[in-house]
Amino acid sequence: VTVIWSPRAIRHLSDLRAYITRENPDAAARVALTILTAVDRLAEFPNLGRPGRVTGTRELVVPDTPYVIPYRLRAERLEVIAVFHGRQRWPTRLWGVTTPRP
């Protein structure tokens, strides 16, 4: 499975790393590496995440972090949609589909 990051997901990862770097650059690097490693693992085990709150998606809760990675599988592609903090309010629309509120 080939992992493809959406522009939104790339921006989220970059923004969260910049935010954490202001207080603790080492922690920012560790968190980013943990997220990247978790997503790389999805290439081997694409169904590792739980069913997503949007039909047709899955969500990976990144171990040892408060982050959740929504993604979807399309043939031999795994598309990373975004990177969200677990306490963050999700947008009302995600890839053109209305996101239900928990």
Report each predicted region and the residues it spans.
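Generic beta-structure capping elements
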Residues: 6-8, 63, 81-86
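Short, flexible helix/strand-to-coil boundary loops that buttress conserved ligand/catalytic motifs
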Residues: 17-20, 46, 82-84, 94
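Basic/aromatic recognition patch in beta-strand/loop cores that engages polyanionic ligands
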Residues: 37, 44-78
